[in-house]
Curated annotation (Swiss-Prot):
Gene Ontology MF terms: arginine-tRNA ligase activity; ATP binding; glycine-tRNA ligase activity
Predominant location category: cytoplasm
Assembly information from the UniProt record: Tetramer of two alpha and two beta subunits.
Species: Listeria innocua serovar 6a (strain ATCC BAA-680 / CLIP 11262)
EC number from the UniProt entry: 6.1.1.14
The entry's keywords: Aminoacyl-tRNA synthetase, ATP-binding, Cytoplasm, Ligase, Nucleotide-binding, Protein biosynthesis
Family in the record: Belongs to the class-II aminoacyl-tRNA synthetase family.
Catalytic activity: tRNA(Gly) + glycine + ATP = glycyl-tRNA(Gly) + AMP + diphosphate
Location within or outside the cell: Cytoplasm
UniProt keyword Cytoplasm present: yes
Gene assigned in the entry: glyS
Protein name listed in UniProt: Glycine--tRNA ligase beta subunit
Gene Ontology CC terms, in alphabetical order: cytosol
Keyword Ligase: yes
Length: 688
């Protein structure tokens, strides 16, 4: 037999961005509780609004199933006394398991006999277990939490009511003075209390009180109303998943309405208007069918269609004040030059241990010019780098960016173009912040890519030099994001930048300018390890086998695009027939070459058989061709060496008693191993 179970946590309004994650957490905790208590059920449904987190468990068993449990006790030698009677240890074990001594048996495990018992456990009634769900509710954790009243519980918002029902029965427990009942609360202004007679009545009972408890249904209702308004007004209201998710969790009974603002505000940059509407007011901007921004907005009311005109006028008044402020800020920004803005950066501290923004920009300029040298950029390009790095943070002191920090870079581009900067420089000001997330859009220009890499690497290494590094989940300065972004850009452009050398030079530069809390060698090693770990994430994103990732990172990690190419090529051919014997042959070369003593050079005059000469000749050809070979051709060249290597080992005793011959043979293998190890640490690849 089974019944439905309903658990609702009624709260003061939660922040919209935490509603979905909170109800999913509740679902998981209840699911885990059911499994831990071995209570069978059919399905769990979740419901949520800004004022409630709810789970409805369908067809929950009325009692636990009876089960057979086994338990291991003391070893036989301890369980029996000298006369073969049960010892105190055995009797104590039987008592603890609530069985009679005659129920004890022996079982052998790895040659040792132990007491074992097998007992039937009668399942408890579900109603006897359900009150312990109180601990499930109180154990929830949130990104933000608070105390209220005199209780000790920290929660996302104060708990105002609780429902816990198994069928028609109320499951009694209390949290912070709030007792469970079968009564919920409807919409704050339109609804009244709702009595729940059965858990399955819950959605309909709340709908009668103007609460759509199903978040998906609320979202769908908003989308349908938006599409209806689009058709009616011949507008275009662009899809915005983040904004839609937020407004869905801001309301309990959604009604879409439109408002207007003065056309003169359309003279503001489009990004300012859209950000004001979306980020500050949670409004949807409106566009024409041709994609032009129109002087209208759409918002979602938490209520019905009554007095919509009044509500629209109120929203218009609020937006008008916001846009008036934005227009004032914009006009004030237009009064100052870029150079005047740049001068203010010397008064803004980037970090107390790393100086001002001006000092950071000077360091980034050095890094960017260094990278340009590696990439063989022309003098004209370097002049653009110098101008760009002299100004690229200037918009941080503008009024608009002060009000709308998310527009940094975007406004820099706008203002730079208005003041006559080269379009390439203006674009790079915007692009240097990219990517803004792990999968975010990358810079599309060479100059923007270069400055983004330089800025991110300088930030990363600067913080490492002053011993500020990510720990666990804590990364307040976004260093993981900086590293990941820099490497994604390098990969996307296919730039063969020697990362180990670049890291070393940036560390030396940072230390020369005062960032000296850690020894240089330690910082270089830590940064290399940190970047290798970010590389692992990139390679995992390409679905590369873990052993191949270990192999290529253990090889030459210097040039990122080449490393990724090597990983992809190895991964692609890992199932080929020739792959296993090739890897085994190359691994054998590398392992034996470790016995090489430095300083010995290969002398062909000491070769004693044709196999030594053949391996030497092919190695010489490989050395001559290697730099010009593609990654695929390099792997093919190694594969072609396999039969030669096998023949060499079958007919040549490397570790001979003759030291001169032994050292000569090790020197030959060492030279070959240097090419193999640069490609990958072959012994990390699993070919069994």
């Amino acid at each position: 037999m089974s019944k439905d179970f309903l658990l609702e946590i009624g709260l003061e309004e939660m922040p919209a961005k935490y509603v979905t994650s909170s109800v999913l957490q509740l679902e998981k905790r209840v699911t885990d509780w059911l499994k831990d208590n071995q209570i069978e059920f059919k399905e769990i449904k979740t419901y949520s609004t800004p004022r409630r987190l709810t789970v409805l468990v369908e067809e929950m068993a009325e009692e636990q199933a009876n089960r057979v449990e086994e338990a291991k006790g003391p070893a036989k030698k301890i369980a029996l006394d000298d006369e073969g009677n049960w010892s105190k240890a055995a009797l104590g074990f039987a008592k603890s398991q609530k069985v009679a001594p005659e129920d004890l048996t022996f079982r052998e495990i790895k040659g040792v006999e132990y007491i074992y018992i097998k007992k039937e456990v009668i399942g408890e009634k579900t109603t006897a277990l359900l009150p312990s769900l109180e601990k499930v509710v109180t154990s929830m954790t949130f990104p933000v939490s608070m105390h209220w009243g005199s209780n000790d519980l920290r929660y996302i918002r104060p708990i105002k009511w609780l429902i816990a029902m198994f069928g028609e029965e109320i499951i009694p427990f209390e949290i912070t003075g709030v007792s469970t009942s079968n009564t919920s609360r409807g919409h704050r202004f339109l609804g009244k209390t709702a009595t729940i007679n059965q858990p399955s009545d819950y959605p309909h009972a709340l709908l009668e009180q103007f609460v759509v408890v199903n978040a998906s249904e609320r979202k769908q209702a908003i989308v349908e109303q938006l599409r209806e308004l689009e058709t009616m007004e011949n507008w275009q209201i662009r899809e915005d998943d983040d904004l839609l998710e937020e407004v869905t969790n801001l309301v309990e009974y959604p009604t879409v309405l439109a408002g207007n603002f003065e056309k003169e505000y359309l003279e503001l940059p489009e990004e300012v208007l859209i950000t004001t509407m979306k980020e500050h007011q949670r409004y949807f901007p409106v566009f024409s069918q041709e994609g032009e921004l129109l002087p209208h907005f759409v918002t979602v009311r938490n209520g019905n269609h009554e007095n919509l005109d009044t509500v629209a006028r109120g929203n218009e008044k609020v937006l008008r004040a916001r846009l008036s402020d934005a227009d004032f800020f914009y006009q004030e920004d237009l009064k100052i030059t870029i150079d005047e803005a740049v001068a203010k950066l010397q008064n803004i501290v980037f970090h107390e241990k790393l100086g001002t923004l001006t000092e950071k920009m000077e360091r980034v300029q050095k890094v960017a010019l260094m990278l340009a040298d590696y990439l063989n950029w022309q003098e004209e390009d370097k002049q653009d780098i110098i101008r760009l790095t002299n100004i690229y943070k200037f918009d941080l002191v503008t009024n608009i960016v002060g009000e709308f920090p998310e527009l940094q870079g975007l406004m820099g581009e706008k203002y730079a173009l208005l003041q006559g900067e080269k379009p390439a420089i203006a674009t790079a000001i915007r692009e240097h912040y990219l990517p803004s997330s792990a999968e975010g859009v990358l810079p599309q220009t060479d100059l923007g890519s270069l400055i983004a890499i330089a800025d991110k690497l300088e930030t990363l290494i600067g913080f490492f030099c002053v011993n500020i590094v990510p720990t666990g989940s804590a990364d307040p300065f976004g260093l993981r994001r900086s590293a990941f972004g820099a490497m994604r850009i390098i990969q996307a452009n296919g730039w063969d930048i020697p990362m180990l050398e670049v890291i070393s030079r940036i560390v030396d530069m940072e230390r020369a300018e005062g960032a000296t809390e850690l020894p240089s060698a330690d910082v270089k090693k830590e940064v290399q390890t940190f970047l290798k770990n970010r590389l692992r994430v990139i390679l995992q994103g390409h679905h590369i086998r873990h052993d191949i990732i270990d192999a290529v990172i253990g090889g030459d990690p210097n040039v990122i695009p080449q490393l990724i190419d090597r990983a992809q090529i190895l991964n692609k051919h890992a199932d080929a027939e020739w792959f296993r014997p090739t890897i085994e042959a190359l691994t054998r070369v590398v392992k034996i070459s470790k016995k090489y003593e430095d300083g010995v050079e290969v002398d062909p005059n000491l070769f004693e058989n044709e196999y030594e000469q053949e391996l030497f000749d092919k190695l010489e050809k490989l050395k001559y061709d290697y730099a010009g070979l593609t990654i695929v051709d390099r792997l093919k060249a190694f594969a072609d060496l396999r039969t030669t290597i096998d023949g060499y080992f079958d007919n040549t005793l490397v570790m001979t008693d003759n030291d001169e011959l032994k050292n000569n043979r090790l020197a030959l293998l060492f030279e070959l191993a240097s090419f193999i190890k640069e490609f990958a640490q072959m012994d990390e690849i699993n070919v069994k």
